A protein has these predicted regions:
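Flexible, glycine/threonine- and acidic-rich loop/arm segments that mediate assembly and lattice contacts
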Residues: 1-241, 245-325
Length: 325
């Protein structure tokens, strides 16, 4: 099986996310739209003023995902009809896809553990925090039942203030409404998708199951594609009032029903002028390393130059403090 096909089978992000190939050396800086500037109304012979859309610069460097792999020459001979190198390539490609799914959410989000490494690309939690300002590292939002007019970050919704609350469909509806122009996807953990299924059935409005243009099964909630990211954990810390300190989040921490049992849910608009992936020099690549020095083995390098950027601050939103029960 080709590496590209393996990637889109294992990663819903890489199946649906549009990618922009970066062809110059300014690979880390991009413009994020903060306002379209609106439009003025004029009369005949009126004085016209200049009102431009507004932008802010953000940083989103590419990461290099991958590893070298090797296949022992004797092992290849003894493996019979199975192509040992092909199996290695397929498994490593799956690992690359799973790592992308993890970083797509958590990359450079926390100062705890391996996700703190600056060689990771920025994930959604970090980019949504930076919708407030380029230096913001927490999620300072508003209660989903209220109004976002006074919120520091309109793209952060809270299921409850300073505590967790069981997911209800009204939370998802408010989340989807926070994305402009219109959300294309809802992203959640497997556990929260199960909860959403149960809520939809109870409301007499089952989720719609369909196939996409590539023939892969898709689930829809209203107009949005709903997909599972298996790298999303259900152990997020509860907020302090309406602020979640994502910089201190520990991805590996145990679930604690009193304070660490929530799961972020995202609504995004995937588009080149919304949430988009970045790649350099093509997509995933397999590089021949030949015979390895000091070993009776052949080697290959699997690599993917990739990243993610949010080119409009209203193209992604997150619901925090929601639990399964």
């Amino acid at each position: 099986m080709g590496v590209a096909k393996v990637l889109i089978e294992v990663s819903p992000w890489l199946r649906d996310l549009p990618f922009v190939q970066l062809a110059n050396n300014n690979i880390s800086r991009y413009k994020m739209e903060t306002s379209d500037g609106g439009a003025s109304v004029h009369t005949v012979d009126d004085t016209w003023s200049t009102v431009n859309p507004t932008w802010e610069f953000r940083e989103a460097a590419l990461a290099i995902l991958g590893d070298n792999i090797s296949t022992d020459n004797f092992g290849e001979l003894a493996s019979g009809p199975e192509n040992a190198m092909a199996v290695n390539i397929e498994l490593k490609t799956k690992g690359v896809g799973q790592k992308f799914d993890q970083l797509a959410i958590y990359g450079q989000t926390t100062s705890t553990g391996f996700l703190a490494q600056t060689k990771n690309f920025k994930g959604l939690l970090r980019m949504i925090a930076e919708a407030e300002s380029s230096t913001t590292t927490d999620l300072d939002g508003w209660l989903y039942t209220g109004d976002d007019s006074s919120a520091n970050n309109k793209q952060v919704l809270m299921a409850a203030s300073g505590a967790s609350a069981t997911l209800v469909l009204a939370m998802i509806d408010a989340l989807v409404d926070s994305v402009r122009d219109k959300a294309t996807h809802i992203v959640m953990s497997r556990l929260m998708r199960r909860k959403t299924n149960a809520l939809a059935r109870a409301a007499g409005n089952n989720l719609v199951h369909d196939k996409d243009q590539l023939g892969f099964p898709v689930t829809r909630y209203g107009e949005q594609v709903l997909f599972i990211d298996d790298q999303i954990r259900n152990n997020m810390d509860d907020s302090t009032l309406l602020v979640t300190a994502i910089a201190s989040y520990d991805y590996e921490q145990a679930i604690n029903a009193s304070a660490k049992d929530t799961s972020p849910i995202f609504a995004v608009r995937m588009a080149e002028d919304g949430l988009t992936g970045m790649n350099g020099d093509g997509m995933i690549q397999v590089v021949e390393l030949g015979e390895l020095e000091g070993k009776d083995a052949k080697g290959k390098r699997i690599k993917f130059y990739c990243g993610e950027r949010l080119t409009n601050k209203r193209a992604a939103a997150v619901l925090m403090n929601a639990t399964f029960s």
